[in-house]
Amino acid sequence: MKLLLCLGLTLVCIHAEEATSKGQNLNVEKINGEWFSILLASDKREKIEEHGSMRVFVEHIHVLENSLAFKFHTVIDGECSEIFLVADKTEKAGEYSVMYDGFNTFTILKTDYDNYIMFHLINEKDGKTFQLMELYGRKADLNSDIKEKFVKLCEEHGIIKENIIDLTKTNRCLKARE
């Protein structure tokens, strides 16, 4: 009986393991679908503040053969506008690149597929770089444990807590979603 219990707990732990794009266990197909922007962080805060070029709100990720297609919304002159971007796989395992306000490379830091996904992005433009981190959820908000995990990851990447914006308290263009 103890052996069965141990086996069952082991299987549960394996199933609950988080995936990362740098790890062997990421199944990119599982990130396909609807997402909501929850938290946004950057070491260059003005990029993610209201009217910042990187203040975009995800609606959908579509997994293609060698790329990821994103549907975003952004607020321009008080109106919600759609943005479509396609990020291509790079030669580095688990890394994607896309042109948007400069050249961006990003990886998936963590995901459990069913609730959340965390991205880390490096933007290069005119010889300058900054980093951006994003937390998306399958629902319009996430529990505080996941948010705290994201804050800790941001701090590990040198992004201070004051540069993390809770987008659940802002206009995320939810009414513009189809």
From Swiss-Prot:
Name used for this protein in its record: Major urinary protein 4
MF GO annotations: insulin receptor activity; pheromone binding; small molecule binding
GO (cellular component) term, any one: cytosol
Disulfide bonds: C80-C173
Record's signal peptide: 1-16
Its biological purpose: Binds pheromones, likely to displace pheromones complexed to urinary MUPs and transport them to the vomeronasal organ (VNO) where they associate with their neuronal receptor(s). MUP4 is highly specific for the male mouse pheromone 2-sec-butyl-4,5-dihydrothiazole (SBT).
Gene name linked to the record: Mup4
Subcellular location: Secreted
Pfam families recorded: Lipocalin
Keywords from the UniProt entry: Disulfide bond, Pheromone-binding, Secreted, Signal, Transport
GO biological process: aerobic respiration; cellular response to lipid; energy reserve metabolic process; glucose homeostasis; heat generation; locomotor rhythm; mitochondrion organization; negative regulation of DNA-templated transcription
Family that this chain belongs to: Belongs to the calycin superfamily. Lipocalin family.
Tissue specificity annotation: Expressed in lacrimal gland, parotid gland, sublingual gland, nasal mucus, and vomeronasal organ.
PANTHER family: LIPOCALIN (PTHR11430), MAJOR URINARY PROTEIN 1-RELATED (PTHR11430:SF76)
